[in-house]
Amino acid sequence: CENIEGLQLRIGIHLGDVIFENNDVFGDSVNIAARLQALAPISAIWISESVHKNISNKQGIISTFVKEENLKNVKEPVNIYEVDINSFHAETAVPVRTPGSAISPSALDKQKKSFPARKVLSIGLPILAIAMAASFFIPSTLKKQHARNDLLPAIDKLVLENFRVPTKAFDMGVEAEKYIAEDSVLIKLWPIISATPKLRTEPEGAEVFWKDYHTPEAEWRSAGTTPLTDVRFPRGYLRLEFRKKGFQTIEYAGSLAAEPMRLDTALIQLDSTSTLPDDMVRMPKSSTHMYLVGLEQHGPKDVDGFLIDRHEVTNEAFGKFIEAGGYTDRSYWKHPFIQNGKEISFEQAVTLFLDKTGRPGPATWEAGTYPDGHTLHPVTGVSWYEADAYATYAGKQLPTVFHWGAVAATWRTEFIVPFSNFSGKGTIPVGSLPGISTFGLYDLAGNAREWCSNESTNAAHRYILGGGWNDPSYAYNDAYFQPAIDRSLTNGFRCIKVLPGDTTIATLLKPVALAFRNYLIEKPVDDKTFDFFLTQFSYDKTPLNEKTDATLDRENWTIEKISFDAGYNNERIELYLYLPKNKKPPYQPVLFFPGSGDLYSKIYNPDGIEGRIDFLLKSGRAIVRPIYKGTHERHDNIKSDLPEATVFYKDHVIMWRKDIGRTLDYLETRTDMQNDKVGYVGWSWGGFMGGIMPAIEKRIKAIVLNVGGMCMTPALPEVDQINFLPRVTQPVLMLNGKHDMYFPVETSQKPMFNLLGTKKPQKKLIIYESGHLVPRTDFAGETLAWFDKYLGPVK
């Protein structure tokens, strides 16, 4: 028992209470023991002061003070002692070493020599048993403590810091589940960091693989074979593949917590490898919203299922069209040619479709062929007429803007664009960058612009979408048309194939009007006209007849549900007033104007602020959340936040103003509000309305607009945002994304900022490398700093 070679242990011991639950043991005592074990040298036994005191009068055990240590997740410092294993050889009790004391070496040597064998067995064997048990118990305990004390807080931090929870949080959850699967905190986190979609394929039996979209070089992870009903996936943006022997592999990009994959009815059709034309992908039937600036007002549109080219048409493929008589066979050319507003003949047109040396072919070619090494580059330098002729030759057609919109996933531009070709240097081989869109289509963003079949309101102009290698990256979000005869060096295309029985194509092929306003040219109305407009927003200060309908208690704040007369249509306004518990009144009230999602909801969720704007409460401010006309329980026939040149829309703007006015009137009846320090936070739609409401309501003293901007659809002049922006004079902070698909930087964000009437030192625009959402920590930090500066710090 005195010499056991090869046994290397280190032991940490603490005396205290522990909790046993579901065959698991945990608590502060376990944590302290585990931390001591981790700190101890090999072959050492480190104990806490509670153990030291317990053994201080025990015969034959000496413990020596080592140091005071701050252990992780332990509130108070811990005094650490080391057990002197040699002391087990002492015959009688010896003084215990304490900080500042010492033992005579001669006395210790004497006691070692006189220690009987039975004492070795009676003390050494129990210690050895403890040590051997610890060698198995402590690693498991450490991992459980690591899961509880390190992984769970790290997951929670990622959740709090990100509007979209990153895959890293999911991976931490998977690791934690190995050791604390039944932990209540982890169980509550799973719905936040993961999704469990019902994935079905026809036929069944496809193996599903996934990886994070942002790490295309990572190894694929298998989730099992379809149907999948209870398998967790990260909630973030993913790359997926559905693989089944004998069938075409389906690539997919998107979040499995969002449509279409989150729908229980989602069914993925697999096609045998010989069924589909080469390099084409099946797209399912969809109701397509148009997330393209200037075309939003045309959605949603029903689009029947169709096939689409996985890649842009290449130089090699276009060369075969030329070899087949593409520029001489008139059967491929179905549409009248228009140049400078006049129709020209086929013979005249083909004289325009020449390469650099005067031979038939794209404008980028030379001597009848494409540049060396560009075989698999997208064909570019072609007119719409040439693209359409090729599609006819191939037995296909150009996509409509609605087909293109159904596959582009422009609402995730900030993910796709970094993996796409907007290099400014030239085209690259198709599919060589991993910036895929929804169903595994490559290069929809950048490389070549892509002609679409629709004409604008002018038959001579056709849409061309996605942007090209020499365009700014935000061109991916913009709807754009140009003369069909244009042969710019970036013009390319891909094709679709309409399936038998399609009932939507006739509607989708119709001309599409583009909404666009050039705010660099448009001018606001003069002051006299604007003063006349203001009169429509006046209202009588009739009694509020306020009533507190409910009080909801939360851990860190209280929610008061209040109602009062709206002052129009005999309606009542519901107000949710959030009051922080960490500060005493009076509070700085922050008025919140939400995004357009509230127009599609019929029930307000009082806890919906968590993870979005609850940082305002944590800062000690109150959140003022009226239910605006047309939203939630006050739902009506307004269907969109887009401005319209209608009396119906104008009436709603007036009602929204009155909702704000009456809300601020109510706040003035309370003594717990600092009504001279009212802030405004507008989110998306609320960011747009932040360019109108503060011009009318001067009780608002400081403004933060989160992803706001100017719209391309006009309203009647008396409620048109452009006429209000110069009259917004309060301090304004604008937080925007470079890849915003609603409010583009150059045509929407910057014009709004420049038109604001606020003095230059008091307005600020920050543009992030993001889409229609800015990083949460930046949103919170910049907002609080802005309010601290212009409303004053919370006291």
For each feature predicted by the language model, list its residue ranges.
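The feature captures the conserved acid-bearing segment of alpha/beta-hydrolase catalytic domains
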Residues: 711-757
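Gly/Ser-rich "nucleophile elbow"/oxyanion-hole loop immediately N-terminal to the catalytic nucleophile
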Residues: 642-683
